[in-house]
């Protein structure tokens, strides 16, 4: 599933081709995504694009009369192509631009979404999200105070979008390893130093992944069709049974909330 770095990589890739350009029309070949494609998108015509933003794992395309909200789901990707590029089986949505380019949405599993809102601040899918991990609001003091009394395993807790957005499965495993924190520890067991270290490494891991263009494990491609390269930096994720790159102990795996967690028993306490 594309996580925050992959969505931010997509945002940076598509923005130059959308902002200060006009959407001539949308071509929707399949409206049956996770939710039906909003009618306002189906009827787009000569809509200037003012900005492309990201909130959590949602892309927000600002138009003069409203906002398109895009979620990539489990297998979605966005590419910028010449206007008359022949669509393939899983190419469901095109935004045809006045520049002769098309923004094409591909989603084999169709768990993504193309929604419309007049105001992102009141949109139901955005209203209850926690702070952005790369912003100042996500601080050591915030994480420490929020974790008080929490018995949930720290891995599962930091993946809760009400706590902090965008720390998905890959980056939760990698951040906890970098912080030396065992994923089974109760969130409430963190002391102030633990919280400071964890906040710092979450920011570092996410920023490094963005700089590397995200992580390509299966479906994710950047807007130019190239893979993300952060997979080469992974220390624990997907390495079950392989030696820890720090101490040599075999990497182990466990389940947290139906998701696989990877960790080093020796390095993480």
UniProtKB/Swiss-Prot annotation:
GO molecular function annotation: 8-oxo-7,8-dihydroguanine DNA N-glycosylase activity; class I DNA-(apurinic or apyrimidinic site) endonuclease activity; damaged DNA binding; zinc ion binding
Which terms under GO biological process does the entry name? base-excision repair
The alphabetized UniProt keywords are: DNA damage, DNA repair, DNA-binding, Glycosidase, Hydrolase, Lyase, Metal-binding, Multifunctional enzyme, Zinc, Zinc-finger
Which residues carry out catalysis? 2 (schiff-base intermediate with dna), 3 (proton donor), 57 (proton donor), 259 (proton donor)
Pfam families recorded: Fapy_DNA_glyco, H2TH, zf-FPG_IleRS
Taxonomically, the superkingdom here is: Bacteria
Quaternary structure, per UniProt, is:
Monomer.
Task: State the protein's purpose.
Answer: Involved in base excision repair of DNA damaged by oxidation or by mutagenic agents. Acts as a DNA glycosylase that recognizes and removes damaged bases. Has a preference for oxidized purines, such as 7,8-dihydro-8-oxoguanine (8-oxoG). Has AP (apurinic/apyrimidinic) lyase activity and introduces nicks in the DNA strand. Cleaves the DNA backbone by beta-delta elimination to generate a single-strand break at the site of the removed base with both 3'- and 5'-phosphates.
Query: What protein name does the entry list?
Result: Formamidopyrimidine-DNA glycosylase
**Organism for this UniProt entry:** Pectobacterium carotovorum subsp. carotovorum (strain PC1)
Q: Which gene encodes it?
A: mutM
